[in-house]
Amino acid sequence: MPSADARPAGRPRNPELDKAILAAAERQLGEAGYAGMSLDSIAAAAGTTVPAVRRRFRSKAEIVVAVIDSLRIQSIPAATGPLRERALALLRNFHANLLRRNSLAVVGSLLTEERRYPELLDAFRRRLVEPRRAALRQILIEGIDAGELPRGVDPEVLASMLIGSFYARYIATSDLPENWPDATLQQVWPAAA
């Protein structure tokens, strides 16, 4: 029986090919949607073969989940420092992630496919949306408890307003200005003078 330390047979995976496959899948998901992408087209765009893609991903849905995971270019900031600054760091982090090429198009594709493939949007919510909202909600709760935000403010509604403003701004103007995180937070949690 082989030892637990034994390497699997065969050549090690090429991390550059892994990146190329994910980039091709992300581009196709953003441009053609889930229904418009295929393992064949992903393999061709990545400069590889379908068997090479299948060795990494069992299905198109599994590739999309990997794309969703790759959309988080920056981790959620650590929970240290003044509360308002933590909220601002989280919103700036969200902004940076949204500005990544294809991020908003991928979100649009997932929304479009929700009726046929609800598990894809669910994966997006679980892996990206819920952790960020939970972190922001916690900061808002701490801000209310510390008296920095008014009592009676609903942290769930406020989190939706702050995060939702990014999507609303983009839909209305096709633009997310660099100062958007600062401008939105200033409306509900003014900086000390």
Explain the meaning of each model-derived region.
Residues 1-6, 89, 93-96, 141-142, ...:
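C-terminal peripheral helix-coil segments that are non-catalytic and often amphipathic
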